[in-house]
């Protein structure tokens, strides 16, 4: 058999494998510093492939995603995929409890499947307060063509990132926190990495580049909006246009009209917006600070422009007002309660979302997690959950388990707040595999908090002001509470979530408020199948990085501007296909 026939045989074996399996998408990310002026002042920001914000990742349910990351920063790097569940592969989650940092000048390749998910998400760098300097971007998971969607196909799909922003870079902000200081009021709010349109000559400096979204009259667009900021809740609105809420973090919602919606740190929403206004002028897109003294924070407002293709003039006049609820603290909470799961719509699978009857499942574990204002522990300013300020392990949790490294963490996280003095510890929750956990998030701080759980979409069953008690369960929504991965907890209030622990691994449970997270307001939930023949969790990847107690296992990497040497079998298949095509042309 000649070489051509051998290659042809290999080609057909490989092509059969590829088409039988789920397809792959490939991205190369070069993460570096660039100089930009989002608020009119030159500053160092973190870019991906020279872009700020980074490129949008766009994939389809069940695709395998390969992201090769080259770290050109001067410090360690991890990318976290906010809301992507990483089914059975917490090794790819990109936080310190699951991954060793990618050293400067090194390449590392993430490879994971977006299994059984659809929706709107984002990614960001999770170490060293880096998100405050950028490195974030949108992450879109489209449904498969065979799965029905509960609305007509939009005429366009637009991603929007919003977030508070400081002119100081992440290293200066980090030092302020290390020195025990507050960060103070942000310098502004960015929309897609750009500063505000000059709607007011006093509040907005001249010469700032602003975001413009161009649309066609009469068309309907899907706007995917993510709050990628540091700690500020933002009210999102478009002058003169209704926002039809359609999806949030992978769950289709009951479709309702809003003139504006509060989007808290770490949250993502999809809106259907119809361009049904006249084109006498452009329209303002606004993201303004919430749950603060909004008179003082007036300058902390992001303003972009919605421009019809036949627009006759620039936007002018006052911004459209946000909610007038200065003396009504229930308005925002009632709006949040109005967001409900569309139980009849298909999600990533053909069956209706509501076929999972979460309200009838027996709870196996209950955790009441309380955060307080920052405290001083051993002379350092820290934040806590249940009186514990988390210290990240030097060795990732599941890697320590697999390679039998002891004393990395303790499975002793308390189910209720500690009564003694606060302490620093690597204390994590021992989750029961296939258990059903109730978590009550009690915010006894004066600031809004957002909480995120990696690895899962949890069910938001209740929220209210005051202290949670067992009687509060009588108010739970056990039918159509939204399933999502990030939930807000209002100051002096609680939010309750239910989690089906069907995804083995070690999963980060944290505040999304970057300052509080940096100071220790997090833990992990370790979920392990006790069966000795455990086949539910994939082993660590071949390219795993080693650190901490396992540092001696790490081989040096040859510094190169090229991609990783290997990104799996699919790359080999592609090479073989290319060789075969060349041989075919010669024959």
Swiss-Prot record:
**Residues annotated as transmembrane:** none
Question: GO terms for CC?
Answer: apoplast; cytosol; plant-type cell wall; plant-type vacuole; plasma membrane; plasmodesma; side of membrane
Where does the record say carbohydrate is attached? 14, 58, 107, 169, 200, 257, 278, 293, 342, 362, 430, 444, 534
Give one Pfam hit by family name: Cu-oxidase_2
Organism domain of life? Eukaryota
Alphabetized SUPFAM superfamilies for the sequence: Cupredoxins (SSF49503)
Which InterPro entries does the entry link to? Cu-oxidase-like_N, Cu-oxidase_2nd, Cu-oxidase_C, Cu-oxidase_fam, Cupredoxin, CuRO_1_AAO-like
Q: Where does Cu cation bind?
A: 80, 452
Keywords from the named record: Cell membrane, Cell wall, Copper, Glycoprotein, GPI-anchor, Lipoprotein, Membrane, Metal-binding, Secreted, Signal
What is the membrane topology here?
Lipid-anchor; GPI-anchor
Residues anchoring lipid (GPI-anchor amidated serine): 562
Could you say which cofactors this protein requires? Cu cation
Biological process per Gene Ontology, one example term: cell tip growth
What tissue specificity does the UniProt entry give? Expressed in roots, hypocotyls, cotyledons, leaves, stems and flowers.
The signal peptide annotation in the UniProt record is 1-20
- This chain's protein is named Monocopper oxidase-like protein SKU5
Q: Which organism is it from?
A: Arabidopsis thaliana (Mouse-ear cress)
Recorded name of the encoding gene: SKU5
